[in-house]
């Protein structure tokens, strides 16, 4: 009905559409493709065979995305799934409680590994019912190699920081 309202009888493409026996969907897509190819220039023009081949699909089942398509491409192949790390949850290693072989192997190289694992075992053996509400954190062991580190910022960086502090707080004479 809309073709009558538009006055398409006078238009030459109306008779072309009647004479070509294409399905409606293919006609719309090929017209969009031909418009885009002529707008792009001579080097991007398609022949009719190439347009029909791309609209119908390739031998491997994939189809090129077309400008006029509203629905997503269901015929494109999905990427393969990544391999699963663990087949079942029982084979997943327990990170909170390391096995005794682990603590024995690393107790010589890391002195804090044994104390950390024993603290984890003691904490996991306690129930949640008998724990007090507020626990004090233990004082850190200063002989622990993980806690005794020094940061060397360098003289120039320290001088820049002091200069910035002097500029921001000119009333403070201590900088």
Curated annotation (Swiss-Prot):
Instruction: Provide the primary localization.
Output: mitochondrion
Which cell locations does it reside in? Mitochondrion
Question: Transit peptide extent?
Answer: 1-11
Biased region (Basic and acidic residues) positions are: 41-63
Q: Where is this region: Disordered?
A: 24-92
Recall the GO molecular function terms of this protein's record.
small GTPase binding
Q: Name one GO biological process term.
A: regulation of cell shape
Keywords annotated in UniProt: Mitochondrion, Transit peptide
- Transit peptide: present as a keyword of the record? yes
One GO CC annotation: mitochondrion
Give the protein name, as stated in the record. Uncharacterized protein C15orf62, mitochondrial
rRNA-binding as UniProt keyword = no
């Amino acid at each position: 009905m809309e073709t009558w309202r538009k006055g398409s009888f006078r238009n030459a493409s109306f008779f072309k559409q009647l004479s070509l026996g294409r399905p409606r969907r293919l006609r719309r897509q090929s017209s969009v493709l031909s418009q885009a190819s002529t707008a792009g220039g001579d080097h991007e023009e398609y022949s009719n065979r190439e347009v029909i081949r791309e609209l119908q699909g390739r031998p491997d089942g994939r189809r090129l995305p077309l400008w006029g398509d509203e629905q997503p491409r269901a015929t494109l192949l999905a990427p393969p799934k990544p391999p699963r790390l663990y087949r079942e949850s029982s084979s997943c290693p327990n990170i909170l409680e390391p096995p005794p072989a682990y603590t024995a192997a690393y107790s010589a190289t890391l002195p804090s590994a044994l104390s950390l694992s024993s603290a984890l075992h003691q904490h996991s053996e306690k129930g949640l019912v008998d724990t007090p509400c507020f626990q004090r954190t233990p004082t850190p062991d200063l002989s622990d190699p993980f806690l005794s580190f020094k940061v060397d910022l360098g003289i120039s960086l320290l001088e820049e920081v002091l200069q910035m502090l002097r500029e921001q707080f000119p009333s403070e004479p201590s900088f």
